[in-house]
Regions:
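Carbohydrate-interacting regions of secretory-pathway proteins
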Residues: 21-235
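Bacterial Sec-dependent N-terminal signal peptides
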Residues: 1-28
Length: 235
């Protein structure tokens, strides 16, 4: 009896462990805020189109940090293990002087893609003032990169200070928020969106923005960037 009890208990513990692991790798319940970053590890993330150890990203004082490096030494963009369709995503971020990074969503992995931006729209994060190259409005902080520019409500904090951002994607309706203000709003896949895609930067990327479900990506652009309090709610 005791032997059977121990065997049953051991089996149950294994099942519980497996269930816990599966729950961490599945889409969370609708309407519930879930942490994408636990403040102490890279659990739940992997390198885009990669397996194994994530390079060039680290944890500093509870923040997820892209360490920044020369172009040929990038650790690469990182993506969530879980794919999302309709969601509200919020996070805090800051960059160093001349820094550049971004958050992408509905990212698709596969041999045909070399980078998340080939499929995933991007919330741009950049040093609008001191970036070494001239920036167009569609390249500046808060923009739906190369598609929709931020409005005049945009107020970005100085380099080195934390900002709060949010993306809402709900059945094609998209909003970008920055420090409490809605700065971008558009409808994905409508005639206006299709025209902008076909005539702009993404005309040579046929799969850009078309996925209705995909991974969340944090960009390694060779500059130091800091993220914390990354949360998502499925809608």
């Amino acid at each position: 009896m005791k032997r059977n009890f121990l065997k049953t208990t051991a089996t149950l513990l294994v099942v519980i462990a497996c269930v816990s692991f599966v729950n961490n790798e599945t889409v969370p319940q609708k309407g519930k805020w879930v942490k994408l970053f636990d403040g102490k590890s890279l659990k739940g993330w992997h390198g885009f189109n990669k397996t194994g150890i994530i390079k060039n990203w680290d944890i500093e004082d509870g923040a997820l940090v892209c360490l920044g490096a020369a172009k040929d030494a990038h650790g690469g963009d990182i993506v969530t293990n879980v794919a999302y369709d309709n969601f509200e995503l919020k996070w805090e971020w800051k960059i160093d002087k001349q820094g550049n990074s971004g958050v992408m969503y509905h990212v698709v992995e596969g041999k045909k893609y070399k980078s998340p931006y080939e499929t995933g729209p991007e919330y741009q994060m950049i040093d609008d003032i001191d970036f070494p190259e001239k920036l167009e409005d569609w390249q500046k902080t808060g923009a739906d990169y190369a598609m929709n520019i931020a409005n005049d409500k945009k107020k970005v904090n100085p380099v080195g200070e934390w900002n709060t951002s949010k993306i809402i994607f709900n059945k094609g309706h998209v909003e970008h928020w920055l420090n409490g203000e809605k700065i971008v709003s558009f409808k994905a896949w409508d005639a206006k969106w299709m025209k902008e895609k076909q005539e702009g930067k993404w005309k040579d990327y046929p799969d850009y923005g078309l996925a209705k479900k995909g991974l969340i990506a944090l960009q390694d652009h060779g500059n130091k960037a800091y993220y914390k309090n990354i949360m998502i709610k499925v809608l």
